[in-house]
Amino acid sequence: MSNNRRLFTSESVTEGHPDKIADQISDAILDELLKKDPDARVACETVVTTGMAMIVGEISTATYVDFPKVVRDTVEEIGYTRAKYGYDSQTMAVMSAIDEQSPDIAQAVDRALEYRNEISEEEIEATGAGDQGLMFGFATNETDTYMPTPIYFSHQLAKRLSDVRKDGTLKYLRPDGKVQVTVEYDENDKPVRIDTIVISTQHAEDVTLDQIQEDIRKHVIDPIVPASLLDDETKFFINPTGRFVIGGPQGDAGLTGRKIIVDTYGGFARHGGGCFSGKDPTKVDRSAAYAARYVAKNIVAAGLADKCEVQLAYAIGVAEPVSISIDTFGTGKVPESKLVEAVRDNFDLRPAGIIKMLDLKRPIYKQTAAYGHFGRTDVALPWERVDKVDVLKEAVQA
């Protein structure tokens, strides 16, 4: 590797990773609530460990959801269905400690997101952010999904690892797994090759390491990674510890919100610190991060920058963002100040405006809780639309 080249690494995890189990349970509960009550206020945290799951948090709703059933169904769907896997959806204990949302927070957000198909301008203006905070969105044109290459391939490999387990191709695989991909960038900051792939997968006790390594290369890596990105110098580490039988919540406790870099851009962009899963769309940690991605992706798709990072920031109880910042890392075709002006004029970034713009009061969140919230091609997510391209092009020419 020449001195002008650099390496960058990102990771992903499978849906059976303990932290991802927790994320999926939290979002499954959110979705069940939103199906029956689109205005439910939800902040649901989950902890999973050997033989049990516990859900805690604050939920305000007029409807009823059978939380233990949602938990068990989610764990079963992931694939923990037998005691010998270290976690069993039918025999695990499920505990719940749920409170109502604090009235102090509610009064900051409320003045009414009631049961209506349309939210009036007055209601949008009157709906404040549920907390202070800063959120980032990012996009780059180095992949068709407008995602950085390392996290793109990490997610693709992690998803493939799960697919070959579920479809029976590799019956000895178990749900827990991790992937890490290191990409080499040239002097023009373009991805040119994959330097290292690390895959660790939980497996049955009676399979050999040689068999695992051969099968993962054949059934997981080769179908996903183009041969043009691999060479004789590419390093493959498949189950480098030699054994991964004990996994999932039996191996490590899992918590909602501990995979925020996996959920976003793999460390390629900055992060405001707030997680997504288990939070209804009045929480700007989630909705504003989605809006920031929507803005950044449309800027790049419009050809106004090769890469773009958008920061939004909010004050609790205040509708308008306190700041909008855009960084194009020297790739912008127009001044960043002009992009900020165009964004202010063409995107409603008030909390209720984001909810309306992206139609977020729907049960769409569980599908985001594994394999990334951004750049997905397997599910239709509203913040991945590129429907503001023409508007932005016109705005920066004005």
UniProtKB/Swiss-Prot annotation:
Chain positions covered by the region annotation Flexible loop: 101-111
GO biological process, alphabetically ordered: one-carbon metabolic process; S-adenosylmethionine biosynthetic process
Cofactor dependency: Mg(2+); K(+)
Pathway: Amino-acid biosynthesis; S-adenosyl-L-methionine biosynthesis; S-adenosyl-L-methionine from L-methionine: step 1/1
A matching Pfam family: S-AdoMet_synt_C
Top-level taxon in the UniProt lineage: Bacteria
Broad class of enzyme this protein falls into: transferase
Keyword Cell membrane attributed: no
Residues holding ATP: 17, 176-178, 243-244, 252, 258-259, 279
Localization in the cell: Cytoplasm
Record organism: Staphylococcus carnosus (strain TM300)
Annotated function: Catalyzes the formation of S-adenosylmethionine (AdoMet) from methionine and ATP. The overall synthetic reaction is composed of two sequential steps, AdoMet formation and the subsequent tripolyphosphate hydrolysis which occurs prior to release of AdoMet from the enzyme.
Catalytic activity entry: L-methionine + ATP + H2O = S-adenosyl-L-methionine + phosphate + diphosphate
Recorded GO CC terms: cytoplasm
Keyword set includes DNA damage: no
UniProtKB keywords: ATP-binding, Cytoplasm, Magnesium, Metal-binding, Nucleotide-binding, One-carbon metabolism, Potassium, Transferase
Binding, L-methionine: 58, 101, 252, 283
Positions contributing to Mg(2+) binding: 19
Entry's cofactor comment: Binds 2 divalent ions per subunit. Binds 1 potassium ion per subunit.
Family as reported in the entry's similarity comment: Belongs to the AdoMet synthase family.
Binding annotation for K(+): 45
Protein name listed in UniProt: S-adenosylmethionine synthase
EC number: 2.5.1.6
Quaternary structure and interacting proteins, as annotated: Homotetramer; dimer of dimers.
GO molecular function: ATP binding; magnesium ion binding; methionine adenosyltransferase activity
